[in-house]
Amino acid sequence: MNLRNNKLHSSFIQRKAIKVISGINNFNVGQIFKIIHACEISKATYVDVARNPKIVSFIKSISSIPVCVSSIDPRALYESVLAGADLVEIGNFDCFYTNGVYLSNDQIIAIVKQVKYLLPYTDICVTIPHILKLHEQIYLAQKLESLGINLLQTEGSITNFSNEKLLEAKKINDNILYSTSMACCALSSVYSISKVVSLPVIASSGINGISASVALSYGASGIGIRSSVSKLGNIIDMSNYIDEMIFSTSKKLYDIDQNNLLYMATSNLSLNKCSII
């Protein structure tokens, strides 16, 4: 793994990368400004924004934080890099699912080849669709690695099984069960994909301060967060939430033993220290 941006490279090598996603369809400059400011305060690794050159130029004019642009349109990604984007992502497919648009492995690979042709010197991340069966996700991840992709990102969804677990967790007020159930699809993808590729894998979709540590123990090199930040009303609350995620990735709170059982590494928990902003 060799990313061109030194900050990104260092964070992924240390497996502490935090990506804050403003939303692939979020063109609200006021809200994006709040997210950028919160990222700067908390020192998030980078931000993921809509593929709009004007938004990219605006962010680069007010901040030094690395900018990722997400789209499935190669031309839009190319124009965003010309505007200053540091890396691009083919993904964040959630908004397409609601419109009944589902990309196959072959379609994703075709888009990747076009983007690599247009942007041979730009770091590229690809999201692995959660709608694919796990063995299909693994195949796609291996194929993308062979094509020279730099980063992979997982997705997740709420299945019938996880929804039952969520209801159970709410009933008994079990935050750990609730958090891992919210993220179970993304976590299973992280665990499976990270075993077969040497690329950094970003865990996204349903990840919070509890499940972030689980994701790292499962092989993730970074965490992607979106709705939990964007739904907050002010910069301080956004910054506090990002701080929580950074703490979760800075301490190995969970680990996997030789029998592949998850346990809490309580020796690494600090109960006497907190940060106040």
Swiss-Prot record:
Coiled coil: none annotated. Pfam families: DUF561. It comes from the Eukaryota. It is found in: Plastid, Chloroplast. The keyword Nucleotidyltransferase does not apply. One of its GO terms (cellular component) is chloroplast. Belongs to the ycf23 family. This is Uncharacterized protein ycf23. It comes from Antithamnion sp. The gene is ycf23.
